[in-house]
Amino acid sequence: MASALGIFIDRNIIKYAKLNGTKGKLKVESYGMKYGENHKELLKQIIEETNSSKNSVVINASEIHYEETSIFSMLKKKDYDKAVEVAYEEIVDKQKLRPELLEYGYILSKNPADSEKLHVLLGIQEKGAMETRANLFGQNVMLYSQMPIGISISNLYGSPLPALIVNIEEDTYITEIYDSEPIKVTRIATGTRNIINTINNEENSISKSYEVLRNMVLPTDDMDQISFEGNEYAPIIVSEIMKIVSEIKAVINKRPGIYKKIYITGTGATISNVETFIEKLIDDVECDILRPAGIEVQKKVAIKEYVDVNSAISLACEALRI
């Protein structure tokens, strides 16, 4: 049975999930997280502890640059690659980038604004950043790919309906899903980073700071007069969530009437009531926690634990859902 290990690398935390099975039926074999900034040592521990030296490993890419363009839908499929390449070269030339230093991938989907064209979402990476990240692993590790997390997170969405996936990690990634495919990714420098830093100033422990965050409860009764009584970290949490809400509204307003559903995932999704809190601040949308679609979960494991490592689960799917 095929197995793959997904690893999501952030500044102060590394999340991992090992999956096995086939495209139609995947199961989480093991999962967890490591804390700290010595990524090379932490990754070595993860590979050893999950016995994954002979399995495909998928990690999140660093320094991703997203662009959107389009190609004509009447083209034959065999001509898609060339058409996208031409569009990519135009973008590179316009922005005066150096193509020899870059690599790119793309996803095609229906164009919500023009039925005669296909929407193209480009993910552009610097080769140097890819090499630096690959060097965190030993030569014996089977590094399958480096995937943009804003794209791979869509692996866990099982509906054809348009939606936003808001992945709240140290930064936040807002992925727009249309016709089952990601069409745009917005990365914002607001997420759990400031919250963790604030808590860590008191707790002096990154791992403990994350546990404090996961045990937080957001108030939802009176949104006009939010009470911080008895919760010293609530102000910073509410402040960061409000910034994220503002960004979500901006995304929704750019495509009016399209998005009626928001899914929250990542570390931020483990804050109790976060989905209700966000839903009450945005008109005419439903907000829920993103449960990993198509993944067999163990009944004895709380869904909150899987949601916390959704970023890693979605990466592992890249090697198994082919």
What is each PLM-predicted segment?
Residues 1-34, 53-61, 157-202, 207:
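Gly/Thr-rich phosphate-binding beta-strand-loop-beta motif of the actin/hexokinase/Hsp70
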Residues 50-65, 142, 255-268:
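Short glycine-rich phosphate-binding loop at a beta-alpha junction
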Residues 131-150, 179-226:
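Glycine-rich phosphate-binding loop plus the immediately following alpha-helix
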Residues 201-202, 214-261, 268:
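Adenine-nucleotide phosphate-binding core of ATP-dependent small-molecule kinases
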Residues 256-262, 271-289:
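ATP-binding/phosphotransfer module of carbohydrate and carboxylate kinases, centering on a glycine-rich
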